[in-house]
C-alpha cells in the first residue's frame, strides 16, 4: 500500500516511510575530463635553466575568438615540441573516429608523437587545449578521404588527402617543408578557426 516500517537500530525506534518520501529516477550525465601528465626533470648539470628559458621564450597569449578572454599558447618549434600533432574527429561519428584512430597509428609509425581527442567538446576548445600545451599541428577528420591540417601560430588550415598526412607532417616537423610550401601545394580552407 506504499508504506514500509523501518527499524532504526541506533535510535531503537521504528519509522514509517511512505511512497511520497522516496523518488527513483534515471539520469544520463555526460562526463568530460581533462588529463594532466605530471613530470619532473631534475638533471644535475643545469639544463633546468635552459628549459626555463625555452618556456619563457615560447609562451604568449592571444585573444579568444570572442575576444573576452586570453588564450595561452606555447609556441614550440615542431623540432622540440614533445607532441607534434593532435588528431580530432570533427563530430562524434563512428567513421570519423575510425579514420582518426587509423591516422593516429600511421603518424606514430612514421615517428611522430601525437594525441587523439575524441571528446565531444567543440573543435575550438580542442584547438585551444592543444595550443596551450605547445602542439604545432592539429589534424581534423571531417571526411573519410581528406582532412584539414591546422598550423598553431597562424591558425591557417589546408585540406590534405588522408594518405598523405603522415608524410606531410613528418616533413613539416623535420623542416623539410615550410608551412608556406604546404599552403601552396594544397587547398587552403577559408574561414578556418
What spans do the regions from the language model cover?
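NTP/phosphate- and nucleic-acid-binding module
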Residues: 1-193
Amino acid at each position: 500500500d506504499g508504506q514500509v516500517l523501518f527499524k532504526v537500530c541506533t535510535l531503537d525506534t521504528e519509522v514509517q516511510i511512505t511512497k511520497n518520501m522516496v523518488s527513483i529516477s534515471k539520469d544520463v550525465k555526460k562526463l568530460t575530463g581533462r588529463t594532466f601528465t605530471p613530470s619532473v626533470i631534475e638533471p644535475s648539470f643545469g639544463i633546468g635553466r635552459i628549459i626555463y628559458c625555452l618556456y619563457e621564450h615560447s609562451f604568449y597569449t592571444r585573444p579568444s575568438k570572442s575576444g573576452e578572454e586570453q588564450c595561452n599558447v606555447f609556441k614550440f618549434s615542431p623540432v622540440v615540441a614533445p607532441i607534434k600533432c593532435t588528431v580530432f574527429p570533427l563530430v562524434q561519428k563512428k567513421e570519423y573516429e575510425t579514420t582518426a584512430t587509423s591516422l593516429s597509428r600511421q603518424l606514430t609509425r612514421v615517428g611522430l608523437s601525437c594525441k587523439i581527442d575524441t571528446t565531444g567538446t567543440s573543435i575550438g576548445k580542442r584547438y585551444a587545449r592543444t595550443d596551450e600545451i605547445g602542439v604545432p599541428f592539429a589534424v581534423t577528420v571531417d571526411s573519410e578521404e581528406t582532412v584539414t591540417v591546422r598550423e598553431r601560430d597562424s591558425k591557417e588550415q589546408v585540406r590534405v588527402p588522408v594518405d598523405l598526412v603522415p608524410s606531410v607532417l613528418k616533413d613539416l616537423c623535420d623542416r623539410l617543408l615550410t608551412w608556406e610550401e604546404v599552403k601552396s601545394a594544397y587547398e587552403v580552407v577559408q574561414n578556418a578557426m
